[in-house]
Amino acid sequence: MALSSIFGGGSPSQQSNLPTSSASSSVKDQLKGQIAQELAVANATELVNKVTENCFEKCLMAPYTSKQDTCVDQCLAKYMRSWNAISQAYVARIQQASANGDI
């Protein structure tokens, strides 16, 4: 084994196997997309868990009455309004950071 191959001085055909910047950029974009999807799933799961924990525990009691439907509907609507406001603010911050080159 020659020392040149150990220190990166191998033949040009060996060096051409390295990924190009466009290929690594594509991989980076794919990873970003996958991470964004996983975060969206995690956030949706967290929303469902919080709604279940807070709204149903607050509103549903034995014996069941129709007032509980109204309570659950209002509680769910409150969480969805809050979720939408927070999501919009988060997306705006991410877009601003991306435009500034911070991301």
Curated annotation (Swiss-Prot):
GO biological process, alphabetically ordered: protein insertion into mitochondrial inner membrane
Protein name per the record: Mitochondrial import inner membrane translocase subunit TIM13
Keyword Transport listed: yes
Subunit structure: Heterohexamer; composed of 3 copies of TIM8 and 3 copies of TIM13, named soluble 70 kDa complex. Associates with the TIM22 complex, whose core is composed of TIM22 and TIM54. Interacts with the transmembrane regions of multi-pass transmembrane proteins in transit.
Functional note: Mitochondrial intermembrane chaperone that participates in the import and insertion of some multi-pass transmembrane proteins into the mitochondrial inner membrane. Also required for the transfer of beta-barrel precursors from the TOM complex to the sorting and assembly machinery (SAM complex) of the outer membrane. Acts as a chaperone-like protein that protects the hydrophobic precursors from aggregation and guide them through the mitochondrial intermembrane space.
Compartments where located: Mitochondrion inner membrane
Region (Disordered): 1-25
UniProt feature, compositional bias: Polar residues: 12-25
Pfam families: zf-Tim10_DDP
Motif (Twin CX3C motif): 55-75
